[in-house]
A protein has these predicted regions:
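Enriched for short, Lys/Arg-rich terminal
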Residues: 62, 67-68, 72-94
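Basic, Lys/Arg-enriched alpha-helical interface segments
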Residues: 2-57, 74
């Protein structure tokens, strides 16, 4: 399956990396690559995430960096909707 990052998801991940980079650019790059690799694996294992809070979505939990990545499967595509840090209040809609 193809993994497609929606614009909001890309902006979310970039913002998290920018925040970390203020203190440590190497750690920010490592986080970015780690999250991207975990999300890209959804192309092979789309049912990896738990059922989502929003109907017709799933959520990949990335414990190492405290992220929740909501996504949905549409046809032969995994659509990455957002990237959220678990210590922040999650929005009601993705």
């Amino acid at each position: 399956m193809r993994v497609k990052w929606l614009r909001k998801a890309i902006r979310n991940l970039d913002a998290e990396a920018d925040y970390i980079a203020e203190e440590n650019a190497v750690a920010a790059a490592e986080m970015f690559l780690y999250v991207k690799a975990k999300v890209d694996a959804l192309g092979d294992f789309p049912a990896t995430g738990r059922p989502g809070r929003i109907p017709n979505t799933r959520e990949l939990v990335i414990d190492h960096y405290h992220f929740v990545v909501p996504y949905r499967v549409v046809g032969d595509e995994v659509q990455v909707l957002r990237v959220f840090h678990t210590r922040r209040k999650l929005p009601k809609v993705w």
